[in-house]
Design a protein with these regions (language model features):
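Sec-dependent N-terminal signal peptides
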Residues: 4-13
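Cyclophilin-like peptidyl-prolyl cis-trans isomerases
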Residues: 11, 17-192
Length: 192
């Protein structure tokens, strides 16, 4: 009996270690599929998934779009009201993941441990956002776009305007309709 329980525990642990959570960010410009790195950013992925499960992102906008840098969303409504968020999470920027083109990372204030719901997708390799860069602590990467970079690039091309206190606000609202969490598949199954 003990042997069976041990074997079952190993199977469950091994199976979950191979699972790769994936989400689809449905926007008014199209869909963006993101593979989340639960192994390297467990707290950040759990935080993002909880917001997604609670439908928090539905109706929020990409409120900050800077061509040649990044697109940011997940915290403001179309009228630029900030949605009430949960408590901030610890910054997992020292996880080895880099702010490279197509990666998703947590937005935050100057306090390294202030990230809540807002995230950004890198349009280029942003080395200054990695630990040791311009902001010594860095911005926590927790996944990468696997499909829909054309949508990300299209969002980056939308004209922006100043709407104090915000700058770089898309003149045309780019709304996140929902964030769909896909059933998890093992990394091995994805390779086939």
């Amino acid at each position: 009996m003990t042997k069976r329980l041990f074997s079952l525990s190993l199977c469950l642990a091994f199976g979950s270690a191979l699972a790769t959570p994936t989400v689809i960010i449905h926007t008014t410009k199209g869909d963006i599929t993101v593979e989340l790195d639960e192994d390297k950013a467990p707290a950040t992925v759990a935080n993002f998934r909880r917001y997604a499960e609670d439908n928090f992102y539905s109706g929020t906008i990409f409120h900050r779009v800077i061509p040649g840098f990044m697109i940011q969303g997940g915290g403001h409504t179309a009228d630029l009201q900030e949605k009430p968020a949960r408590e901030p999470i610890a910054n997992e920027a020292h996880n080895g993941l880099k702010n490279a083109r197509g990666t998703i990372a947590m937005a935050r204030t100057s306090d390294p441990h202030s990230a809540t719901s807002q995230f950004f997708i890198n349009l280029v390799d942003n080395d200054a956002l990695n630990p040791g860069g311009a902001d010594n602590y860095g911005y926590a990467v927790f996944g990468k776009v696997t499909s829909g970079m054309n949508v990300v690039d299209a969002i980056a091309k939308v004209p922006t305007e100043k709407r104090p206190p915000h700058a770089n606000v898309p003149a045309e609202a780019i709304t996140i309709q929902s964030v769909e969490i896909l059933p998890e598949k093992s990394k091995e199954a994805k390779r086939k």
